[in-house]
Regions:
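Transmembrane-helix motifs of polytopic, lipid-linked glycan transferases
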Residues: 6, 28, 32, 98-119, ...
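Extracytoplasmic catalytic/substrate-binding loops of multi-pass membrane glycan-assembly enzymes
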Residues: 45-60, 69-84, 90-95, 148
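Alpha-helical transmembrane segments of multi-pass membrane proteins
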Residues: 101-105, 133, 149-162, 176-179, ...
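Short helix- or helix-capping micro-motifs
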Residues: 128-133, 183, 187
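Short acidic/glycine- and proline-prone juxtamembrane loop motifs at membrane-interface regions
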Residues: 140-151
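Membrane-interface transmembrane helices that cradle and orient dolichyl/undecaprenyl
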Residues: 119, 158-175
Length: 199
């Protein structure tokens, strides 16, 4: 009787572990499906409905043809990333809408990973990203590649690596290096990025 209870208990624990792993895998897959749908829809819709690129994107493309360390309005990263895509894809409008969504999706991935480490719960991680989708700068304004879109992944990466440094209570060279790298690129994306660094 003692052995049968242990056997049943062990089988129940195995089933609970299996069910927990299956749910985690399903949530991970759901997250990947969500970001794929976001990437495809927000690339296709403006590609099919807009007659031309948004004005900020056109302005930054013009800056990209003559890259400097800064311009009268904004730092150079936005023009640099657009110029890279221009060298690869030429004047295909869909490519610039795709670039926007790549930056947004990277931010989603970082937020999902950060929430997963913070909450230790994939459901809350997925909810975090879904709530972020409701924020104005992550949906309707995303087809326009400008400094606001350009800074999104670097903002998320700086918060993530800052948290990792404070959470571990020890200095990790890799985390410090990545924090510095993403902070630098973030500042070169939008000058107001300095507020995050000061905070």
């Amino acid at each position: 009787s003692i052995f049968s209870n242990k056997y049943v208990s062990s089988k129940l624990n195995s089933y609970k572990i299996y069910k927990m792993l299956r749910n985690k895998i399903n949530l991970q897959n759901l997250f990947y499906i969500f970001i794929a749908i976001h990437l495809i829809l927000w690339t296709l819709i403006p590609s099919l409905t807009n007659n031309n690129l948004p004005l900020d994107t056109i302005e930054h493309l013009a800056w990209g043809s003559n890259l400097d360390w800064g311009f009268n309005k904004h730092p150079p990263a936005v023009a640099f990333f657009l110029e890279v895509f221009y060298q690869i894809f030429g004047s295909q409008d869909w490519a610039y809408y795709l670039l926007c969504q790549i930056f947004v999706v990277i931010a989603f991935i970082v937020v999902f990973k950060f929430a997963e480490e913070l909450f230790k719960n994939k459901t809350l991680s997925l909810i975090s990203v879904l709530l972020l989708e409701g924020v104005y700068f992550y949906n309707f304004t995303t087809p326009e590649f400008n400094v606001n879109i350009c800074q999104l992944p670097f903002w998320a990466l700086c918060v993530y690596y800052s948290w990792r440094l404070f959470d571990k209570h020890q200095i990790n060279f890799k985390d410090c290096f990545l924090l510095g790298l993403f902070a630098g690129i973030g500042f070169l994306s939008k000058y107001l990025f300095i507020y995050l660094l000061i905070a």
